[in-house]
Amino acid sequence: MTPKEFKKTYWPDIAASCEETGLNPLFVAAQAALETGWGKSAIGHNLFGITATKKWRGAVKYVRTFEYFDDDKQGHRFPKVHSITRMPDGRYKYVVDRAFRDYTSVRECLTDHSRILLTER
């Protein structure tokens, strides 16, 4: 997807969502473009790579990813660990299946993304 196609596809939903939340639509669009490589690698309708924690009650999609940690004791974080390799710099590369939120629509994703950004921690 080209940047122009990305804008045509996602801008209407991003603009409408931001109108409701007060978030800057340019910020939201930029983050979505960065996270998906201009729409090339979105996980379902998940434009932001939002992972599914234990509290998440919606649908989940498992995707194989690479994660890097300073030790080899992080496997408990993932449903499946395929390999752990010590890198030359001393860090560990994990090949894992990671759980991502699987939204039914782009609007559902944008609503959840806004909620995450606007919730005080």
How would you name each of these model-derived features?
Residues M1-R121:
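Catalytic cores of secreted/periplasmic lytic hydrolases that degrade extracellular macromolecules
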